[in-house]
């Protein structure tokens, strides 16, 4: 009998470890409404509803709260939908308590019985630290096999060109065919190549920013002077770009600086683009085109960060690095 009780306890413990429970509170304003539980891909772009499937579960809000439980699902992100709101969480093992804070009507992962809760970890990255660069990157690498890692990759992380292949190889095969961001990333990895020091530049054609003639990169790179291809994709880090170009001009007085960027609509960014053209003699390219037609695609820039490739006078890569 003692052995049997221990055996049952072991089964119960294992079962509990492999299930998630989410306790969603603070919903008093929606008392009596129905909350539906939906399953989404890691990037939250598509879910079961898009394929005509029913929700996983539903519950009525009683005393300002609902409770959902199920088997841990590391390959998906779940969403709880009630009138006018869809709130997401990662269905990891353990009991997660979410508190709906109004305003602005967002669920706060208050606590979890999982001491290694990635829901709580993500919340701290997001709302306490505003996604610090290295901690966010580490979150993605730690969760490369999980849906929550690719959700962060798709929206907030700076993963650099020479890291993408390795990161992709860590993903479960089940996610690769059903997650939009992974499908797009695989398409890029198959169509492009990763550069390393000593490699020749990759040619591309792009329109100059002021709607001038198209520019062929091979007309500049490998023509007897150093060339910096500097992707300006994070406008709140302008000072880092200024400093980098100044340093490059001190080291390579005849360097050509080519800056692919977006056509930002705000006056501050427009002013900075003008500054790059006039004060820093940079050639600005409009890289707002569809991703697969962009210079970003050719150079494996997947995300929003500033990054440079430095080529020597013969067009060989000297170094590649983020501009921080």
Set out the residue ranges of the language-model regions:
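Thiol/disulfide oxidoreductase modules built on the thioredoxin-like
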Residues: 278, 287-324
């Amino acid at each position: 009998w003692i052995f049997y009780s221990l055996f049952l306890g072991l089964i119960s413990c294992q079962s509990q470890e492999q299930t998630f429970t989410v306790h969603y509170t603070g919903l008093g304003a929606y008392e009596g409404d129905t909350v539906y539980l939906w399953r989404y891909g890691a990037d939250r772009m598509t879910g079961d509803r898009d394929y005509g499937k029913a929700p996983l579960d539903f519950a009525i809000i009683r005393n300002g709260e609902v409770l959902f439980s199920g088997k841990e699902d590391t390959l998906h992100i779940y969403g709880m939908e009630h009138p006018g709101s869809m709130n997401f969480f990662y269905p990891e093992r353990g009991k997660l308590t979410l508190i709906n804070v109004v305003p602005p009507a967002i669920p706060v992962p208050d606590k979890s019985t999982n001491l290694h809760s990635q829901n709580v970890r993500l919340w701290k990255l997001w709302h306490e630290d505003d996604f610090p660069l290295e901690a966010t990157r580490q979150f993605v690498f730690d969760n490369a096999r999980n849906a929550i890692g690719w959700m962060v990759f798709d929206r907030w992380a700076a993963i650099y060109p020479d890291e993408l292949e390795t990161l992709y190889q860590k993903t479960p095969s089940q996610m690769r065919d059903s997650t939009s961001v992974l499908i797009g990333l695989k398409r890029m990895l198959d169509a492009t190549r990763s550069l390393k020091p000593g490699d020749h530049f990759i040619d591309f054609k792009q329109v100059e920013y002021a709607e001038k003639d198209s520019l062929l990169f091979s007309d500049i790179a490998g023509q007897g002077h150093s060339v910096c291809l500097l992707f300006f994709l994070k406008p709140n880090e302008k000072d880092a770009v200024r400093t980098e170009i100044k340093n490059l001009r001190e080291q390579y007085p005849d360097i050509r600086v080519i800056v692919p960027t977006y056509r930002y609509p705000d006056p501050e960014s427009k002013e900075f683009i003008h500054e790059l053209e006039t004060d820093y003699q940079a050639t600005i390219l409009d890289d707002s085109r569809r991703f697969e037609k962009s210079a970003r695609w050719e150079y494996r820039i997947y995300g929003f960060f500033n990054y440079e490739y430095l080529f020597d006078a013969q067009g060989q890569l000297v170094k590649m690095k983020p501009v921080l």
